[in-house]
């Protein structure tokens, strides 16, 4: 492949972004993610209690706008971080793409890495619509939101290896997922296979997360300076991704395979 095709061009706002200030801010403030998570949990239980006594809100137009905004953000994030990761993969190889800390402070990706971790706080707003519209709130939904927020803020401050893969995969899956949510909220009929594809993509993402953690753990044993992380981070990350993998597999079975079996028996 012609490497000139993969040459990265920065936009002005990406060039002007000061990653040192961003990393310093996160080092000083990452524990606020626990406060956000606590307020989020309080809203879930308090909101559900309050909504038991009143009719649901429709909120179709705000939901379309919300989902579309996150879809556009995720699409741009996926394109920019994806271009950077592809460039590193093609020019320096897999190990460098996993271990290199330049994803946090390099051209193009530095802005989108910080935007990613910050976005995990407003993304908690997804649940507001579920509560106010009195839809079913499953454990996977709020567990995933809380743990991603906590882990991303905790990891960004240390610029740990593997972050580029984690963030790029998440951007990509969210680009598809929020586009699907926007279409559904707007009243479009979307094939059930599309929803299945999204869940399978999430399962693949979690499986890849486990693989990346294994690679980081293996490579850091030989050269921690070139593949920087620490055991505590890998432990929490592995536990998180493994729990996601099991929960998404269970969700896939219950939502798609289990329903098909029940429908077949009913016939």
UniProtKB/Swiss-Prot annotation:
Kindly state the tissue distribution recorded for this protein. Answer: Expressed in liver and barely in brain.
Query: E.C. number, please?
Result: 2.3.1.199
Which positions does UniProt annotate with glycan attachment? 2
The keyword Glycoprotein appears for this protein: yes
**So what does this thing catalyse?**
a very-long-chain acyl-CoA + malonyl-CoA + H(+) = a very-long-chain 3-oxoacyl-CoA + CO2 + CoA; hexadecanoyl-CoA + malonyl-CoA + H(+) = 3-oxooctadecanoyl-CoA + CO2 + CoA; (9Z)-hexadecenoyl-CoA + malonyl-CoA + H(+) = 3-oxo-(11Z)-octadecenoyl-CoA + CO2 + CoA; dodecanoyl-CoA + malonyl-CoA + H(+) = 3-oxotetradecanoyl-CoA + CO2 + CoA
The record's section on InterPro entries has: ELO_CS, ELO_fam, ELOVL6
Q: Name one GO molecular function term.
A: fatty acid elongase activity
Q: In which pathway does it act?
A: Lipid metabolism; fatty acid biosynthesis
- Mind listing the GO biological process terms from this record? fatty acid elongation; fatty acid elongation, monounsaturated fatty acid; fatty acid elongation, polyunsaturated fatty acid; fatty acid elongation, saturated fatty acid; long-chain fatty acid biosynthetic process; long-chain fatty-acyl-CoA biosynthetic process; positive regulation of cold-induced thermogenesis; sphingolipid biosynthetic process
**Entry keyword ATP-binding:** no
Q: How does it sit in the membrane?
A: Multi-pass membrane protein
Keyword list (alphabetical) reads: Endoplasmic reticulum, Fatty acid biosynthesis, Fatty acid metabolism, Glycoprotein, Lipid biosynthesis, Lipid metabolism, Membrane, Transferase, Transmembrane, Transmembrane helix
GO cellular component terms listed in the entry, alphabetical order: endoplasmic reticulum; endoplasmic reticulum membrane; fatty acid elongase complex
Task: Provide the function of this protein.
Answer: Catalyzes the first and rate-limiting reaction of the four reactions that constitute the long-chain fatty acids elongation cycle. This endoplasmic reticulum-bound enzymatic process allows the addition of 2 carbons to the chain of long- and very long-chain fatty acids (VLCFAs) per cycle. Condensing enzyme that elongates fatty acids with 12, 14 and 16 carbons with higher activity toward C16:0 acyl-CoAs. Catalyzes the synthesis of unsaturated C16 long chain fatty acids and, to a lesser extent, C18:0 and those with low desaturation degree.
Name of the protein in question: Very long chain fatty acid elongase 6
> From what organism does this protein derive?
Rattus norvegicus (Rat)
């Amino acid at each position: 492949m012609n490497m000139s095709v993969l040459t990265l061009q920065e936009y002005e706002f990406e060039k002007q972004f000061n990653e040192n200030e961003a990393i310093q801010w996160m080092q000083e403030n990452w524990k606020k993610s626990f406060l956000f998570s606590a307020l989020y949990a309080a809203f879930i239980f308090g909101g559900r209690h309050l909504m038991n006594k009143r009719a649901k809100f429709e909120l179709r137009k705000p939901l379309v706008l919300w989902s579309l905004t996150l879809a556009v953000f995720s699409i741009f994030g996926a394109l920019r971080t994806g271009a950077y990761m592809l460039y590193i993969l093609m020019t320096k190889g897999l190990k460098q793409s996993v271990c290199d800390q330049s994803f946090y402070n390099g051209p193009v990706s530095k802005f989108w890495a910080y935007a990613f971790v910050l976005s995990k706080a407003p993304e908690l707003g997804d649940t507001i619509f579920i509560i106010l519209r009195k839809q079913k709130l499953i454990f996977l939904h709020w567990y995933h939101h809380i743990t991603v927020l906590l882990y991303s803020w905790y990891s960004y401050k240390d610029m740990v290896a593997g972050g580029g893969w984690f963030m790029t995969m998440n951007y990509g899956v969210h680009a598809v997922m929020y586009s699907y949510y926007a279409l559904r909220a707007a009243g479009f009929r979307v094939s059930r296979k599309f929803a299945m594809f999204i869940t399978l993509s999430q399962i693949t993402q979690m499986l890849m997360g486990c693989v990346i953690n294994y690679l980081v753990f293996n490579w850091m044993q030989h050269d921690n300076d070139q593949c920087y992380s620490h055991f505590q981070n890998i432990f929490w990350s592995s536990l998180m991704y493994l729990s996601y993998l099991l929960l998404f597999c269970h969700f896939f079975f219950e939502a798609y395979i289990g329903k098909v079996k029940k429908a077949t028996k009913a016939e």
